[in-house]
C-alpha cells in the first residue's frame, strides 16, 4: 500500500472560471508560455538511452502525475524500449501492465523475449526507478494471418467533430502531463458533474505533431483522461491506476488529423476501486484500441 500511496495523483477539478488559489499560480501563466517550457513527446522519446542490458530515461517534471510518470506514459516507454531491443517485431496486438510502484527518478526499462513463434511474439518488460519496480508488463505482438472471420460489435458514438466541441482540459491543478494534450468534450460529462453518468467521450490529440500511426504515441494519449468514475466525485481526490490491459484492433491505424476519440465508461466504482473500459476511435470511425483499467480511488 505504501507504494500505491506514493504514486497517488490529486485531481483538483475546479473550473478555471473559479478564483485561483495562491498555491497554483503557475496556471496564471499564458498557455503559450507554458508550452514553450515543455518537452515535446518526440523529444522525450528521443532522449531514451541504450545501456548494456536495458534502456534508461529521466522524465522532466512536465510529464509527471504528481511525482511519478502516469500509466499511459509508462506503458508507452515500455513499448518503445521493447521495439528498440527487439528488431522486426510484428504489430502489437495486446498488452497487460501492472503498476507496482511509483515511476520516479532515472527509469531503467528492460525487455526479455518470452517466446517467439511463427506469427506471435511475447515479450516481458519491466520498468524500475528510484523506488524499485514500477511497472511489470507483458506485450504480445502478432503478424496478420488469413482468416474467414471479419466481425466487430463496437458502435462509434455519434458526436460532433473536435472543432465543434468545447475544451476539456480547463480545470485548475490538473496533472502536469495534461498540458501536452488538446482535449474536446464530445459527449458525457466533465469530472465532478452532479447527477451525471460516469462516462465521457473526448477528442484527444498531442500538441506535439508527429507520426500519428505510432502505437507508442497512441498509448501515451489513450490514458490521458482522468478515470470516468471522477464524474461522480464531489471533492478533489487522489487516484492511482493499478492495472491496465489493452487490445489493439487495428494493426496499422491511420490518422491524418491527429485527433482520436476516447470513449471512457465506468462499469463499477465501489469500495475504493473503479473498473472501466475505454475505446479509442480513429477519425474515420474505426475502433483501434480497447482498454480495461482498474483504479484505486481514495475518496
PLM ranges: what are they?
Residues 13-16, 34:
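Short hydrophobic targeting helices and cationic amphipathic motifs
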Residues 33-299:
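Terminal targeting signals and extreme-terminal segments of soluble enzymes
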Amino acid at each position: 500500500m505504501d507504494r500505491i500511496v506514493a504514486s497517488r495523483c490529486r485531481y483538483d477539478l475546479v473550473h478555471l472560471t473559479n478564483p485561483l488559489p495562491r498555491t497554483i499560480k503557475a496556471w496564471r501563466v499564458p498557455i503559450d508560455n507554458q508550452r514553450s517550457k515543455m518537452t515535446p513527446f518526440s523529444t522525450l522519446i528521443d532522449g531514451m538511452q541504450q545501456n548494456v542490458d536495458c534502456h534508461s530515461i529521466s522524465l522532466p517534471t512536465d510529464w509527471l502525475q504528481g511525482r511519478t510518470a502516469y500509466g499511459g506514459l509508462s506503458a508507452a516507454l515500455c513499448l518503445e524500449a521493447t521495439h528498440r531491443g527487439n528488431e522486426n517485431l510484428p504489430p502489437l496486438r495486446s498488452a497487460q501492465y501492472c503498476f507496482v510502484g511509483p515511476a520516479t527518478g532515472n527509469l531503467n526499462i528492460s525487455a526479455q523475449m518470452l517466446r517467439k513463434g511463427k506469427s506471435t511474439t511475447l515479450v516481458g518488460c519491466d520498468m524500475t526507478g528510484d523506488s524499485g519496480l514500477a511497472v511489470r508488463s507483458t506485450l504480445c505482438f502478432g503478424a496478420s494471418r488469413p482468416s474467414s472471420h471479419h466481425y466487430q460489435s463496437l458502435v462509434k458514438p455519434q458526436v460532433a467533430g473536435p472543432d465543434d466541441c468545447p475544451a476539456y482540459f480547463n480545470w485548475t491543478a490538473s496533472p502536469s502531463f495534461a498540458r501536452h494534450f488538446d482535449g474536446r468534450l464530445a459527449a458525457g460529462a466533465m469530472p465532478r458533474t452532479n447527477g451525471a453518468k460516469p462516462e465521457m467521450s473526448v477528442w484527444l490529440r498531442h500538441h506535439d505533431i508527429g507520426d500519428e500511426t505510432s502505437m507508442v504515441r497512441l498509448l501515451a494519449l489513450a490514458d490521458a483522461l482522468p478515470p470516468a468514475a471522477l464524474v461522480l466525485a464531489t471533492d478533489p481526490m487522489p487516484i492511482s491506476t493499478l492495472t491496465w490491459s489493452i487490445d489493439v484492433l487495428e494493426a496499422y491505424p491511420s490518422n491524418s488529423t491527429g485527433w482520436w476519440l476516447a470513449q471512457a465508461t465506468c462499469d463499477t466504482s465501489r469500495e475504493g476501486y473503479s473498473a472501466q473500459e475505454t475505446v479509442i476511435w480513429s477519425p474515420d470511425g474505426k475502433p483501434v484500441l480497447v482498454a480495461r483499467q482498474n483504479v484505486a480511488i481514495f475518496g
